[in-house]
UniProtKB/Swiss-Prot annotation:
N6-(pyridoxal phosphate)lysine found at: K206
Binding annotation for [2Fe-2S] cluster: C328
Catalysis performed (reactions): (sulfur carrier)-H + L-cysteine = (sulfur carrier)-SH + L-alanine
The protein's assembly and partners: Homodimer. Forms a heterotetramer with IscU, interacts with other sulfur acceptors.
Listed Gene3D superfamilies: Aspartate Aminotransferase, domain 1, Type I PLP-dependent aspartate aminotransferase-like (Major domain)
Pathway the protein acts in: Cofactor biosynthesis; iron-sulfur cluster biosynthesis
A GO cellular component entry from the record: L-cysteine desulfurase complex
Entry protein name: Cysteine desulfurase IscS
A Pfam family that the UniProt record links to this protein: Aminotran_5
Names of required cofactors: pyridoxal 5'-phosphate
Length: 404
């Protein structure tokens, strides 16, 4: 068993060895290194063929047409292209956008940018289990609403939104619907023929592919139009200029092919590990699972251990690679904005830790993690006067603290 144990799959995954092996064949002189846009010689044709194959593999995972897949540098760029691209293109129809307070920063920040440009954005409050109330979404829709952006699976708490139902509402009102599926692609079935979703952001490195490559699904029927955010040689049907990174695209394609093939196996494996970890720590008293436990991907377990500072717990678990919040915000000491949006008080939000597992996590690693967590939580609580008061039955919310 290799230490530290990696339990932060929601931040990034190791590249599957099968993917790495394939990528290496597209970089050097003895491989297929050409520019896929070079139309005048075999080096270019072979690279273009490799890109076409990857496009099909990615489309297959969504049951989409390969022509609906646009390559980008990752889900952040896809989110930006989808949100700003759609809002700008349809701005003559209206300037109102709807999203949710628990979205990833790559969705919230483009929305903030739109606000600076004069758009109006409604940020929905999720319920305390992290899920969106469809009635509230319906009530927020207006005649000038041009875009709804709701993530499929939340990166911090792993809850699954009802994308199919939201899609129905949007299609009824002829509103463009964007979904950030960075955390769900390869983990849950996504079928664009069944779901009325117009734009889907995808990332390779959350699906055992390389970092720095992603894609945006752009529906053709009914046709969705976007304003390009990256201008240049007109690659990717004008949606996204820039030479295609063949080796990364091949890696993403292979990763998505494997994910489709092994989805059920990966799901069952993660579920067994999730339940094992939860059963191993839930009797520690004052343990809360954040987010709905049923409507959730099995790869994620976000837990608050009351009276234990999340940061101190991370420090104590030096042999476990885990996180509090998302990797993008883990440098700030602010409590997680996602947990706050669930109506959680700062203390409990501060005491949360996210464990996320994947294809290469073993039962042995989970058992070791359980042991480490139990020791650390017990030790930290022994040091806490608040824990003593709680054990004595003092209601801490009624305590008046003296200011010095």
């Amino acid at each position: 068993m290799k230490l530290p144990i990696y339990l932060d799959y929601s931040a990034t995954c190791p590249v599957d060895p099968r993917v790495a092996e394939k990528m290496v064949q597209y970089m050097t002189m003895d491989g297929t290194f050409g520019n896929p846009a070079s139309r005048s010689h075999r080096y270019g044709w072979q690279a273009e063929e490799a890109v076409d194959t990857a496009r099909e593999q990615i489309a297959d995972l969504l049951n989409a047409d390969p022509r609906e897949i646009v390559f980008t540098s990752g889900a952040t760029e896809s989110d930006n292209l989808a949100i700003k691209g759609a809002a700008h293109f349809y701005s003559k129809k209206g300037k109102h956008v709807i999203t949710c307070k628990t979205e990833h920063k790559a969705v919230l920040d483009p929305c903030r940018q739109l606000e600076r440009e004069g758009f109006e954005v409604t940020y929905l409050e999720p319920e305390s289990n992290g899920l969106i109330d469809l009635e509230k979404l319906k009530a927020a829709m207006r005649d000038d609403t041009v875009l709804v952006s709701i993530m499929h699976v939340n990166n911090e708490i792993g809850v699954i939104q009802d994308i199919a139902a939201i899609g129905e509402l949007c299609r009824e009102r002829k509103i463009v619907f964007h979904v950030d599926a960075a955390q769900s692609a390869g983990k849950l079935p996504i079928d664009v023929q069944e779901m009325k979703v117009d734009l889907i952001s995808l990332s390779a490195h959350k699906v055992y592919g390389p970092k720095g490559i992603g894609a945006l699904y752009v529906r053709r029927k009914p046709r969705i139009r976007l304003e390009a955010q990256m201008h240049g040689g007109g690659h990717e049907r004008g949606f996204r200029s820039g030479t295609l990174a063949t080796h990364q695209i091949v890696g993403m394609g292979e990763a998505f092919r494997i994910a489709k093939e092994e989805m059920q196996k990966d799901y069952d494996h993660a579920l067994a590990l999730r339940n094992r970890l939860l059963n191993g720590v839930k009797d520690l008293e004052a343990v809360t699972v954040n987010g709905d436990l049923e409507q959730r991907v099995p790869q994620n377990l976000n837990i608050s251990f009351a009276f234990v500072e999340g940061e101190s717990l991370l420090m104590s678990l030096k042999d476990l690679a885990v996180s509090s919040g998302s990797a993008c915000t883990s440098a700030s000491l602010e409590p997680s904005y996602v947990l706050r949006a669930l109506g959680m008080d700062d203390e409990l939000a501060h005491s949360s830790v996210r464990f996320s597992f994947g294809r290469f996590t073993t039962e042995e690693e989970i058992d070791y993690a359980i042991e480490q967590i139990r020791v650390a939580v017990t030790k930290l609580r022994d040091m806490s006067p608040l824990w003593d008061m709680y054990k004595e039955g003092v209601d801490l919310s009624t305590v008046e603290w003296a200011h010095h």
